[in-house]
Amino acid sequence: MFLKEKIYFYSLTIVGNISVTPYGKTRIMGIINVSPESFYKDSIKRQEDEIQDTIIRMQNDGVDIVDVGGMSTAPYLKTLVPKDLESKRLHNAISAIRQISNIPISVDTVRSDVIRSLLKLEVDAINDVTGLKYDKKMPDLAFEQDLPVILGAYLSNRENLYGDGDIQDTSSLLAESIRIANKSKIDDDKLIIDPSIGFFRKEGFNPFYSKTLGMDWYVRDIDIIANIKLLTSLKKPICVSISRKSFIGSLFGLDVEDRLIPSIIAEIYGVMNGVSLLRTHNVKETRQAIEMLEMIH
């Protein structure tokens, strides 16, 4: 195992039966999108057999958790859908998964009503890109259901623009989300933080991005990855979602299908600097890269 520098924090976080900790095994979260609007078309699985085949493949490739999304929140796309449609998509997908697997499932949504509609399907975590700030009912629901939450860095007040969304800004926004969670009595060991790569923009088409001034988003994203270790001061496990993101395309002029190698390099840099959970489209390649790092180090 790659021995990370020991980071003192409150407690490990359990998602289903999987522990997520800064100084333990790096965990892999595989992405399944059931929203046809999502930016990476190879991640879109809508039919039951497609979803089940993907789960089997991911498990064979070494996935720990799957993150299922029913609505794209990419800032640069017009992808908002009604919550009933999002719920229906997710219900069908998670039902298909539960027919064949007990793998821990995280639900990628900002809507508490969507989570509530899925509770009978045994979901294991909430992945909220707005860090409990968009839907005011989400914190209480997470507490009520004792669900771990991945808190995305998010600036909810569009009138109070941050200069760049740099690592200091990002840390402050995540600290705000931690305080919101604590106010709703969500235990610290239920929280994972995510710096929201790709979500800090000057302009966007939905309410789920953070509006900033100053540096362009792709410069900001590289700055966050370069300084990711500073987020360990928040004493929470860190999740990053770098896989095939648009900053890689902007930096290298690459289409989404050609962004694998830069994605893997950035992910491994994150692991070497305190990241505990990698949310990725590329489970097999990410697992191989982590194992190689463990052999070398």
Question: What name fits each language-model region?
Answer:
Residues 1-39, 297:
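N-terminal amphipathic alpha-helix/helix-capping segment at the start of soluble metabolic enzymes
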